Amino acid sequence: MRAHFGGSSRKSLVASRVSLDAAVKGADANSASALSSELFFVADVLSTNIAVRRALTDPSRDGKAKAAFISDLLGKKIGALALGLVTELSSLRWSSPKDLVLVVEQLAIEAEASAANIAGELDRVEDEIFTAATAFAGSSELRKALTSDATNAKAILVADILKGASGSTVKLVSQMVNAWRGRSIESAFADYQWALAARRNRLIALVRIAAPLSQAQLDRLTTSLTSKVGQPVRINIEIDPSVLGGVSVKFADEMVDGSVSNRLAGAARALAGSK
C-alpha cells in the first residue's frame, strides 16, 4: 500500500496524479495504454539503476540539468507525454529515491486503468485482478512459478491463466510478475489494486441535490462532468433536503459547488474573514 509514503513523497504523489489527470484528459484508450506502457518502462529503468534514481531525486541538482539528463536517457525511448511527466516528477521532492519508482509505477497502473475506463472495462479489470490475486496467492505451485526468474515462462503462464481476460488485466499482471520490486505476491497485488481503486475514485462524482434529477438533467450533468474530466465518469446521487437550490458536486478532491446553502456559507465565511 502507498500509505507508507513520508511527507515529501506523499505531497509529490498528489501532484503527480494531478499531472496524470491532465495527461489522460481527452485521450483515447490506445493512447492512455501506450502512456502506461512507457511509464512502466521508466519504472523498470529507475528500479534497476540506483544512480539514475539518485540523479532524478537529488534536490541540489538544477532542474534544467535534470531535464537534459532525462531527455538524453529516455528521449528516444518514450513519447513526449511520458517524457514530460517524468521531467515533472524529477522537479518534485522525494523522501527516498525508491519512492519515485513506486510513484511512476502507480501512474503507469492508473494510466492503464484510465484506458480500461475509456473502453468501458474498468469494473471488469478490477474484478479480474481480484480473482487473479486470490488464485495466485492460494496456490503454492503458482507462487513458485511466478516468483522465478524465467520471464518467458511466466509470460506464457499468465497468458494461459488469464485466457479470456481483459487485455488491460493481462498487461497489468504480466508487468507485475516481472517486477516484484522486493514485494510478496500479496503486497504486489495490494499495490496494484490500490492504484486501480485510486483511479476509480478519481472518476466518481458524488452529487448532492434537494430533489431527484430527471433523466434529461442527469444526462446533461453526466455530459458536463465527463467534459470536465475528459473521461467517462460515474455519478452517485444523494438526495439532501438541506441543499436549498442548485447542486453540490464532490469530484475527486475538488468541490464544484452551485448550491445556495453553500454559496451563503461561503459568503458568510468571506464576511467573517474580512473583519
Tell me the role of every PLM-derived stretch.
Residues 1-244, 248-250, 254, 259-275:
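Elongated, mostly alpha-helical coiled-coil "stalk/stator" tethers of large membrane protein machines
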